[in-house]
Amino acid sequence: MLFNINEKGEPLVISFAPFLSPEAIKHLQENERCSDQSQKRTAQQIEAIYTSGQNILVSASAGSGKTFVMVERILDKILRGVSIDRLFISTFTVKAATELRERIENKLYSQIAQTTDFQMKVYLTEQLQSLCQADIGTMDAFAQKVVSRYGYSIGISSQFRIMQDKAEQDVLKQEVFSKLFNEFMNQKEAPVFRALVKNFSGNCKDTSAFRELVYTCYSFSQSTENPKIWLQENFLSAAKTYQRLEDIPDHDIELLLLAMQDTANQLRDVTDMEDYGQLTKAGSRSAKYTKHLTIIEKLSDWVRDFKCLYGKAGLDRLIRDVTGLIPSGNDVTVSKVKYPVFKTLHQKLKQFRHLETILMYQKDCFPLLEQLQDFVLAFSEAYLAVKIQESAFEFSDIAHFAIKILEENTDIRQSYQQHYHEVMVDEYQDNNHMQERLLTLLSNGHNRFMVGDIKQSIYRFRQADPQIFNQKFRDYQKKPEQGKVILLKENFRSQSEVLNVSNAVFSHLMDESVGDALYDEQHQLIAGSHAQTVPYLDRRAQLLLYNSDKDDGNAPSDSEGISFSEVTIVAKEIIKLHNDKGVPFEDITLLVSSRTRNDIISHTFNQYGIPIVTDGGQQNYLKSVEVMVMLDTLRTINNPRNDYALVALLRSPMFAFDEDDLARIALQKDNELDKDCLYDKIQRAVIGRGAHPELIHDTLLGKLNIFLKTLKSWRRYAKLGSLYDLIWKIFNDRFYFDFVASQAKAEQAQANLYALALRANQFEKSGYKGLYRFIKMIDKVLETQNDLADVEVAAPKQAVNLMTIHKSKGLQFPYVFILNCDKRFSMTDIHKSFILNRQHGIGIKYLADIKGLLGETTLNSVKVSMETLPYQLNKQELRLATLSEQMRLLYVAMTRAEKKVYFIGKASKSKSQDITDPKKLGKLLPLALREQLLTFQDWLLAIADIFSTEDLYFDVRFIEDSDLTQESVGRLQTPQLLNPDDLKDNRQSETIARALDMLEAVSQLNANYEAAIHLPTVRTPSQLKATYEPLLEPIGVDIIEKSSRSLSDFTLPHFSKKAKVEVSHIGSALHQLMQVLPLSKPINQQTLLDALRGIASNEEVKTALDLKKIESFFCDTSLGQFFQTYQKHLYREAPFAILKLDPISQEEYVLRGIIDAYFLFDDHIVLVDYKTDKYKQPIELKKRYQQQLELYAEALTQTYKLPVTKRYLVLMGGGNPEIVEV
């Protein structure tokens, strides 16, 4: 029961406005359009905020205000009576959830201040209080809630932890893999399994490649709705389906025919060029022209008549015919310019070549794939079993548990579906199929609100599938009854210079084939305000390319990293912006594709004095010097006979032994022993029994004694103390923590050392104990080529930002530099020995023995790696998916800019050439060309070249070495120091003086009204004492002191592994039990146990409840029997809220709380409150809680206009239950 009352004691009734009809929304849109507001909401924003009663997909372009729309929609729901806790709001990151929560909080505060309706104020205040418990967060966080609450239904304990550290996951995986591998190597099908391992690893001894295959298959399966079913039903889908030429998908045939036709068209374009030379001097056709005409005609004929001439069964014959028809080279040369006419077709032919042979051998690899399927399934089950045993899971496990709970428990699923008024999702384009399934289970089928942008889907490496968004988009447009699509196209972030160049680039680049979205009028960016359309000539986008014709060799050898010259170009532009236009450094951001190989940027910027902060680099925590020193110290403490670790410790700054010292120690060998460790030599050196005691001088002897004494104390402490304390003892004993503070990058070094102590502490808290296990865990991390996350330290605010494009998503910056545009897209995945696909399953390269094709030969075997047909199909899809994501990455990078965007790259000016005739092209770059180009820079140059007659809103400029001299780059202007005497005429100094006066006045007001300032709008009875005790004078006020425990209460700590159950948790469980306990039945142990199963507490807390004491209360006390006799008059766990006046500040506030139990009769009320506090005398608790019960009584009296005649405390913290009347 929930009751709110006003100052007169009357119940509050709030009348909420209904949701808007489509007609009302149109009327609101018209009013907004005609209003004189400076910043108006768009018609689409209004539609997205107020439309209700159906599924809604909001396609929100960059900078279109999607967060604003979500916040406004949430607030509108609240104002129309939907409590915030009835909204499910999913965000992509924890940070986004925090920001969204803060925005809602600010909106609620603003709404409370604006409204004059008292009932609404109280309601909104309650929403504000509920905000912190509302379901606003990531899908992972919500899944954890579901499993914590209902995990028992599928046998999962609620007391689990999340393995967020990849290193810990890899250690467990390695243990499971090794055990399973040995089992499979000794099974009945061992020969087939060995062939499988050799297919990927070459031999059975080096299993690293096979292990990586298994891990990848496992991880991929975890992103599906049901990993086990996917592995059983989809993993071998393509291998079972594509076994003949006739099985090749029509789409792939169409792509081949399209490449043939495009080649014919491009070749015709080339032959039509003026300088081509169709005729000889005699006027007849040239041999070259005749040959090319034949190619054009035959390619066109074969495409047109493919079905009757070849068909799928004759595909292999078509491949041979085309291969014999076209030249082996890629280019056609006209006037010394090479045109890559045949390049794309050659790539397609390569894909389909030798199909008959491949299909003949492909069937031989099927038993291997079945073994792989069995192994991955077994690995998944075994790995999960280990995690269940450790009660430690990955996020994907928790999500699958949540799905299983909702699928298998109809009552739980329906309770969520009935509870949530709306299921809202931000960044919907980055969902995977596992998350989509969870959202489907939470929704009632017509209450989903999804916000996203297909053009900003850039998390494929996390198994995000943009096709989920695309499918919804298409379905809702074709069938409006399923849902509504709302487009937010207006951009409120960027100036027209940025919007125009973005539209120009992607209208020529992006479509459904590459990019997954046709960049037409639906997706083009539109300025949201007039101010954004004001032109600035100096903000036109620029593609700045270092001319590599005379490259000085400063670029990395693999051409993947950014060169010094490119960074210098950026530095030059930044200096110009800062000096000439006064642009602060923090307004400038550099975007890169990856975190690696960016040291040259920091180094170059330091040379020019440009401050820069980065979002981190490669994980090198365990490789940092200070951490390596500490790890070797711990290794030495664990085992002093580890020579490598011992030498590292001796050479470290903690003991500072030099090479001469170590040489003298090394010569103290015992001649009778073949192998003698360094630790033994140190001990012999100290007692003078080494082979050459004369080499140990007094200074060295002193150092050795100090070392052994220190090491002995550390080893003794390691047996008794915690890892955390041991590490800090090492820091303090040898002052190592203080030492690193004097070195370069002191902040980072100290942060790393501090983190080591924290991680050791976390390691022990997770159930692992001891120095040996910690060292073993670290060594396993290093063995698996992993590292721990780097520690972040505070960065300067006034500095240029360097971050990855992924990290920049959702952010905006005035000036954006997109660096390393000449870096080739990573195509590593499409060259692996296997490729996974959600629909097709796995495709592999099969190492076939083709000895039979060669006839007689003395060779035992002839192995050839073949791309199986499933592999080729997966490869083509993966290539397009990779290019599409790179295109979307470029879109994200460009749309971060508010004022200007720069593209930085490197190219040869002399090799820059025309690609094809623009007159023969449509709006888009040809598909074959977009597939062929593999850098941002190539795309931009192709657009600039082919569509040169259009205004593309960006300029291409080549930078020479002469433009990058020290004089040309310039230097930063340093601000001059002001003369203090000049401040006397400075207006700003007067303003500062007035501001200081105002601050002083504010401080005085704060002091006078301190009680009101510290008084929240809503308080609970138990909080009142904590609020007023430090603020009120003690005159006339009774301060209820907490009773302190006497010394006789002291008990020795328990050294068991089980954590002590908190008293507050026991109290909470007691209240839940008393609320659900059926009083119509006899109260006995069985009744209590049945009721106990229905409360949401963990088993440890339930076990800690003293059920005999509760049974005694009901059976042996008159009040307990009173509960059963008058149960019809009983109200349990009843919330209340009343308005009270603060005696000090005279400010009104809402007092709210929950009454444990009360009996409502016709003429009076009886109040009951349970307490689990420990006590010596009951009078202690009576004094402590008297004021609280008075407040409860006041609330009941104001509500029912009846007196509270009896107030009882039920004390459960003693030996037996006691009843105290207050």
UniProtKB/Swiss-Prot annotation:
PROSITE patterns found in the cross-reference section: UVRD_HELICASE_ATP_BIND, UVRD_HELICASE_CTER
> Domain UvrD-like helicase C-terminal spans what residues?
524-810
Q: Name one GO cellular component term.
A: cytosol
Q: Which cofactor does it need?
A: Mg(2+)
What InterPro entries has UniProt attached to this entry? AddA, DNA_helicase_UvrD-like_C, DNA_helicase_UvrD/REP, P-loop_NTPase, PDDEXK-like_dom_sf, PDDEXK_AddAB-type, Restrct_endonuc-II-like, UvrD-like_ATP-bd
Q: Which SUPFAM superfamilies does this chain map to?
A: P-loop containing nucleoside triphosphate hydrolases, Restriction endonuclease-like
CDD domains on file: DEXQc_UvrD
Specify the UvrD-like helicase ATP-binding domain's residue ranges: 39-495
Task: Report the EC code(s) recorded for this entry.
Answer: 3.1.-.-, 5.6.2.4
Keywords of this entry: ATP-binding, DNA damage, DNA repair, DNA-binding, Exonuclease, Helicase, Hydrolase, Isomerase, Nuclease, Nucleotide-binding
Role according to the record? The heterodimer acts as both an ATP-dependent DNA helicase and an ATP-dependent, dual-direction single-stranded exonuclease. Recognizes the chi site generating a DNA molecule suitable for the initiation of homologous recombination. The AddA nuclease domain is required for chi fragment generation; this subunit has the helicase and 3' -> 5' nuclease activities.
On subunit structure and binding partners, the annotation says:
Heterodimer of AddA and AddB/RexB.
Name of this chain's protein:
ATP-dependent helicase/nuclease subunit A
